[in-house]
Design a protein with these regions (language model features):
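Pol beta-like nucleotidyltransferase catalytic core
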Residues: 1-55, 59-87, 93-191
């Protein structure tokens, strides 16, 4: 663990994510091992009507390239795709995992199902497509279709800022709190 990184280092990482671009070689991906939230298969079935969805995980497996060509490097694998289906395992306030950020980092557009009130407005909600469980998602599906057919529209959508600058301070603050708490715990143990 590098304790010497700076706020500027965090900013560089966020800038790299915001500037990531899909190669647009393939339509959509879904990398998941299960469908416990009972939404991944639903999204797969709907999106598959628009284009071919490659599934490199255990769920709906139809693609071995993540393992065979990309040595299980998910980000490099996702770079080939325009879209990534990435619902969270559960939808609850403040719950967000790597799924959304992996899509951003690879430059593909996330088709996301999760907390719509992403904490502190750290993420540009216009840079992803929200698929809502149990709701009418026809507009989301139409948008996927439009973006898939129109490269200029896709590029404009993809060029949006994905992670807001407020994330730098948020992550720096979290880092400081964790390090301070670790120091407290260590000092308590040494007494």
């Amino acid at each position: 663990m590098n304790l010497n990184y700076t706020k500027n280092d965090i900013k560089k990482v966020i800038d790299n994510i915001n500037n990531a671009k899909s190669k647009k070689n393939k339509f959509a991906s879904l990398v998941a091992s299960h469908d416990i939230p009972k939404i991944r298969t639903e999204i797969f079935n709907k999106i598959s009507k628009i284009g071919e969805v490659k599934c490199a995980g255990k769920l709906l497996h139809n693609d071995d390239t993540l393992k065979n060509e990309f040595n299980n490097n998910k980000i490099e694998y996702l770079r080939d795709f325009k879209f990534n289906i990435c619902p969270e395992n559960t939808i609850s306030d403040g719950y967000i995992t790597e799924k959304l950020f992996d899509s951003f980092k690879a430059g593909c557009i996330p088709i996301y199902s999760g907390d719509e009130n992403i904490e502190l407005d750290l993420v540009n909600k216009n840079a992803l497509l929200f698929y809502r469980k149990g709701k009418d998602n026809s507009e989301v599906l139409k948008e996927v279709e439009r973006l898939n057919k129109d490269d200029k529209l896709f590029d404009a959508f993809q060029n949006q800022i994905k992670i807001n600058d407020s994330m730098v301070d948020y992550l720096w603050d979290r880092r400081e709190k964790i390090l301070n708490r670790l120091e407290e715990l260590i000092n308590e143990r040494l007494k």
